[in-house]
């Protein structure tokens, strides 16, 4: 790969790592900690690719993107950011970024994206511009996460916002499927038009479909949990989709079951399956992105405070239990639990005992044992969860990096429980696990595990 890359980041380590990697790959690199310097280089005509952080000492990288597009149309910009929310991904797409990666990023992945961007630049292919939209006021979506699966989902959501393809959103109950559909609508060029969520009952009667179309008026129409619809209702949807008015609404659907399997079993119409499956978004269950649980819990604490329920924080032990819990009801259950804890906690700091009481004192190891019963082997439980994970992606593969994600989700609860059993004594924990103490320390840091020392009662 060749070309000149402009790197802007106030973190010296990131500048050094990117400079070394890009130079070894054959690129020339100009690196700076200043957004002003970056813009001067752009205006001088330097660079075939920009890699920029968002929060800089002298400005916001996202706010500079429209200016870069005006000065140098077709100059690709890869945004890197520690602000790991769907809002950042959407803002990057709205601002005409070529790509977006969260921190900490995977260096080989970033290098591949940089190589593709430089190749597109050489071919003089200008990246299509996403129609700019204003963000709705008061948006507070619980779509928070730094895991690879969620970041891949954010990028895909940003790409499909203004594409008129049907969208199928798959995921377990409580994962936030309807919120994702609402985000796609709210940040699209249909945001001023109605957003209508339809249940099976809304399609009953001779005028059911026509009434729905009259309500949606060219906005966004979502068929909620479409896998539960009977054959007659499915047929009504097919006939409605075959005779959509002009302007036609954006069609989306949500499901917590594998529609492909239902279709093969003869329980879901093939013609409807292909009409709804333009783009499939797979929303991971909360137990499949354990690293995001503390982020979400803190997010819901902040929302509860803004709602006037009071200011609370989790103790380290309480957060450890929250993170280790299975959360069968996913994000919805987590939010309801946090709000209940905010209301019932006796002090500003929420204790482990209070969390145990609200959760019904379910042992954290249930998250590993799963639903297979007391006698199920751990390997069988893992195999069952992995099969479910692949099924939720339909005919698509999960995001890259599955091996590391699965290992991280296994390691985190194992180390947390071992630390709890040894009273937070890292030397004893390392001995219990059979690993080097330095290795344990590195894993604690990498997995963002909270360690609390306490005296063990003998």
UniProtKB/Swiss-Prot annotation:
One Pfam family cited in the UniProt record for this chain: Sigma54_activ_2
Domain Response regulatory span(s) in chain numbering: 4-118
GO cellular component: cytoplasm
GO MF annotation list: ATP binding; ATP hydrolysis activity; sequence-specific DNA binding
Compartments (UniProt record): Cytoplasm
SMART domains found in the cross-reference section: AAA, REC
Main location: cytoplasm
Keywords: Activator, ATP-binding, Cytoplasm, DNA-binding, Nitrogen fixation, Nucleotide-binding, Phosphoprotein, Repressor, Transcription, Transcription regulation, Two-component regulatory system
Keyword set includes GTP-binding: no
Superkingdom, taxonomy of origin: Bacteria
Modified how: Phosphorylated and dephosphorylated by NtrB.
Protein name: DNA-binding transcriptional regulator NtrC
Naturally occurring in which organism (per UniProt): Rhodobacter capsulatus (strain ATCC BAA-309 / NBRC 16581 / SB1003)
Upper lineage: Bacteria, Pseudomonadati, Pseudomonadota, Alphaproteobacteria, Rhodobacterales
Encoding gene (name): ntrC
């Amino acid at each position: 790969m060749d070309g000149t890359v402009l790197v802007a980041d106030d973190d010296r380590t990131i500048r050094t790592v990117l400079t070394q990697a890009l130079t070894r790959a054959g690129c020339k690199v100009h690196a700076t900690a200043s957004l002003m310097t970056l813009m001067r280089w752009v205006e001088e005509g330097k660079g075939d690719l920009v890699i920029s952080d968002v929060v800089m000492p002298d400005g916001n990288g996202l706010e500079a993107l429209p200016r870069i597009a005006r000065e140098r149309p077709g100059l690709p910009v890869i945004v890197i950011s520690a602000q790991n929310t769907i809002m950042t991904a959407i803002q990057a797409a709205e601002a005409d970024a070529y790509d977006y990666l969260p921190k900490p990023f995977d260096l080989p992945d970033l290098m591949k994206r940089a190589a593709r961007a430089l190749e597109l630049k050489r071919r003089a292919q200008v990246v299509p511009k996403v129609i700019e939209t204003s963000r709705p006021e008061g948006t507070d979506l619980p779509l928070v996460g730094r895991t690879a699966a969620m970041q891949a989902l954010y990028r895909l959501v940003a790409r499909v916002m203004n594409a008129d393809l049907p969208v199928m959103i798959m995921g377990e109950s409580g994962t936030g499927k309807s919120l994702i559909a609402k985000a796609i609508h709210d940040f699209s060029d249909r945001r001023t038009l109605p957003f209508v969520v339809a249940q099976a009952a809304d399609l009953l009667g001779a005028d059911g479909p026509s009434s729905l179309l009259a309500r949606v008026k060219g906005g966004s129409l979502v068929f909620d949990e479409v896998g539960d619809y009977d054959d007659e209702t499915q047929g009504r949807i097919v006939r409605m989709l075959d005779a959509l008015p002009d302007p036609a609404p954006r069609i989306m659907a949500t499901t917590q079951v594998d529609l492909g399997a239902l279709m093969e079993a003869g329980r879901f119409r093939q013609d409807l399956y292909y009409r709804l499956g333009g783009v499939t978004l797979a929303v991971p269950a909360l137990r499949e992105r354990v690293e995001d649980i503390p982020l979400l819990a803190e997010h819901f604490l902040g929302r509860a405070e803004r709602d006037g329920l009071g200011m609370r924080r989790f103790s380290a032990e309480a957060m450890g239990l929250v993170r280790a819990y299975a959360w069968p009801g996913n994000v919805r259950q987590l939010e309801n639990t946090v709000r209940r804890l905010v209301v019932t906690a006796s002090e500003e700091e929420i204790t482990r005992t209070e969390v145990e009481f609200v959760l019904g004192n379910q042992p954290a190891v249930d998250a590993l044992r799963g639903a297979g019963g007391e006698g199920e082997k751990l390997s069988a439980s893992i195999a069952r969860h992995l099969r479910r994970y692949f099924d939720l992606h339909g005919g698509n593969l999960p995001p890259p990096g599955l091996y590391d994600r699965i290992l991280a989700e296994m390691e985190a609860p194992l180390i947390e429980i071992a630390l709890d059993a040894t009273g937070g004594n890292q030397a004893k924990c390392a001995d219990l696990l059979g690993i080097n103490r330095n290795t344990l320390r590195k894993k604690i840091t990498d997995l963002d595990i909270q360690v609390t020392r306490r005296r063990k009662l003998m």
